[in-house]
Each structure stands twice: as structure tokens, then as C-alpha cells.
């Protein structure tokens, strides 16, 4: 009888060990499932957030965890008040969808990623390539009749992106309406890039 009880105890211990192992496996799988669900939710959010963008831009933004040097698209970095939105969007043009990176190496890696996977092309703006660029403008232009200011003066961004805003918008004068814009353009022999609050562009 003692031997029988010992065998039974062994079987119970083995069964208990098996149950514990299965529970551990289930916990591990649950963590994996939760991790994948979180990742899928993150990818879904990126897809929805960049719905109006090209496929290549969405694919790059999905790599943000892998490439820490991805800063974001210009539209996420440079903001402006409602009354200037049309003018700033026009001034930025296609660059509004450019992808900002910390440096050229990150941009190079992402270009290779797009090529290898045949995801198309994207335009990158490495902050390291913009840093220190001298952008000279005639500040007296802001005193012209109807002038609102240079476009980079009408946007908001974190201080680390001030040079980016100046690089993209620092040479574009925002003017209140087309009549004043034409008058300023004529006075300066059409040598300026001007955008009106309604989005008319002169260059």
C-alpha cells in the first residue's frame, strides 16, 4: 500500500509540474499576444494618422521604433495658427510630407529600406544637413504695405526645429492679399517669393 501511495504521489507531482509548465507557457504566449496586439494597434494608428500620405511615408513611420533617428514628417513638426494655415501649407508645398531625420546616416538607412522592400520613394530632411545654414533676408520687407511677416515667423515648433522652419520658410514673405502681393513683387522686380493668406503664390 505504501508503494502504491508513493507512485500516486509521484504521478500527482508530475501532473502538478505539467500544470505549472502549461500555465507558464500560457502566460508567455499571453504576453506575446499582448505585445503583438499592441504592435498591431500602433501600426493601425500610424496607418490612420498618415492616411493622406503616400505608402512610402507610412512604411517609414512604421519603422520609428527601429530607427530612433526618425523625427517625423514636416506637417507634424511645424504648426501655425488657423488664419495662417492656408498660406503656410502653400508655402511648404510638397515639403509638408518630407520626413525629418536626425542625420544623413538615418536617411541613408531608410532610403535603403524603401528600395529593398520596393515601397517607393520619400524625401528626407536630415537636421544635421540643415544646421548652421545662413539664410539672409531683407527684414525691411516686413514693413511693406500688407506684409504679415516671413513665413517662418508665423509658425510654431520646438526650439530644436527653429532652423528647419527657417530653412523651409525663411525666404517666403506672407502678404494679406493678392493686390498688395503684386505691388510688392513689382517694386522688387519679382525677385521675391510671396504667398498670400488665401494661398496665392508669387515667385
Indicate where each model-derived feature is located.
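Hinge-like oligomerization/junction regions that interrupt long coiled-coil arms in large cytoskeletal
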Residues: 34-203
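Extended, EK/Q-rich alpha-helical coiled-coil segments that serve as long dimerization/scaffolding arms
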Residues: 1-51
Amino acid at each position: 500500500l505504501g508503494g502504491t501511495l508513493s507512485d500516486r504521489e509521484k504521478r500527482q507531482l508530475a501532473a502538478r509540474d505539467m500544470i505549472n509548465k502549461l500555465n507558464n507557457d500560457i502566460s508567455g504566449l499571453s504576453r506575446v499576444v499582448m505585445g503583438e496586439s499592441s504592435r498591431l494597434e500602433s501600426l493601425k494608428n500610424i496607418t490612420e494618422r498618415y492616411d493622406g500620405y503616400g505608402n512610402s511615408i507610412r512604411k517609414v513611420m512604421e519603422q520609428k521604433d527601429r530607427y530612433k533617428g526618425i523625427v517625423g514628417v514636416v506637417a507634424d513638426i511645424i504648426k501655425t495658427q488657423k488664419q495662417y494655415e492656408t498660406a503656410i501649407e502653400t508655402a511648404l508645398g510638397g515639403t509638408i510630407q518630407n520626413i525629418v531625420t536626425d542625420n544623413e546616416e538615418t536617411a541613408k538607412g531608410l532610403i535603403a529600406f524603401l528600395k529593398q522592400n520596393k515601397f517607393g520613394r520619400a524625401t528626407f530632411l536630415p537636421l544635421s544637413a540643415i544646421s548652421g545654414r545662413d539664410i539672409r533676408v531683407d527684414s525691411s520687407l516686413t514693413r511693406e504695405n500688407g506684409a504679415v511677416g516671413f513665413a517662418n515667423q508665423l509658425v510654431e515648433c520646438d526650439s530644436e526645429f527653429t532652423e528647419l522652419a527657417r530653412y523651409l520658410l525663411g525666404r517666403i514673405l506672407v502678404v494679406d492679399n493678392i493686390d498688395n502681393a503684386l505691388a510688392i513683387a513689382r517694386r522688387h522686380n519679382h525677385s521675391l517669393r510671396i504667398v498670400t493668406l488665401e494661398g496665392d503664390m508669387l515667385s
